[in-house]
């Protein structure tokens, strides 16, 4: 009997890439591939790449350099593929810069991987970065029950891809294409199958997830709020999340879902990028800081216990000290539970790359450090406010010490507990007893029997 071929997939960047990597693995499982955690042991290595920042793209070439050396040292015939947004943006240039690469495949062509690999085995080098007319989701197989169980009680489900916003700093519209939404029936079908296989929490993902406008079973276009309501009716699906959102698409129906659906977790990632109206206009965000504050006020009125996270870019071309102070002010006023902050990175082909007033790395680094201080203080305050609170925790994986398990709070915080009799995929009610820099610790009070709800007791609003 022939031994199975081994597959190693490494994901860079966003949750969409994690999801896509899983779907590629599912497709290749049908071709006899089994996953390995060791690239040196693999017959096929896939790097699923991110192009959002220059540093992310350069990581890929560093990884390819390591793979080239390892392949030469071992004398192996490992097939090396580059997928994702770097593949889409750079295409055949990747093979010129890294001749070790056998296959370059863009995000819309993953369902064609088996036929591409057959061509590689015939000695060809393959580049496929087209936007095919067929929907890749119609052709990618669902994960097996064994694969779902191995991935744990949480899962991602893509509901839309692409972006029509054309922020001046961003490559996503060029690498992922226009906004396209899946049909409600396909999303619900995928979610039901995951729940039947033991998944208890689903995160809906998309480049601009709250721009979702899929066809409903009634033939009408449904927004994300109505989709969430439909998914909340799946028996056994205890938690729902979604990411990443744009303020322009935060409509009243979606805000009402936060008010009405206990399964929808009280934690929202809503990138703002800057607190300066002038910079927001230059970024083509098409909203100002006051609109952002209004959205936050509506969300907190609808769901008083909601917590927020965000993304920030510092050092955008032309950003003055006054612009940056506006960003610090917004961060302090909102009080984010968590946030990601980055220095502006020139992305070739975007309008901002042609801007005359690029800032020095020294200025960008200094501003990033100042913003990080504010955001870290806000996160610490939020975490400390959790002391003594009672949360329902979904147990996801073993801890480092015997008997320990690690779960997630409604706010995505890691929570370390000792829970005799409980296992991965179970919910336990926990009193938070300690706050660390990267996780919380808690004392188990009891098991949660009603897994169709997030909590059997209301959470208290927190101020960071």
UniProtKB/Swiss-Prot annotation:
Places the protein is found:
Cytoplasm
EC no. given is 2.8.4.3
Q: Name one GO molecular function term.
A: N6-isopentenyladenosine methylthiotransferase activity
Give start and end of each Radical SAM core domain: 149-383
The note on the cofactor says: Binds 2 [4Fe-4S] clusters. One cluster is coordinated with 3 cysteines and an exchangeable S-adenosyl-L-methionine.
Q: State the GO CC annotations.
A: cytosol
**Which named protein is this?**
tRNA-2-methylthio-N(6)-dimethylallyladenosine synthase
**Gene designation per UniProt:** miaB
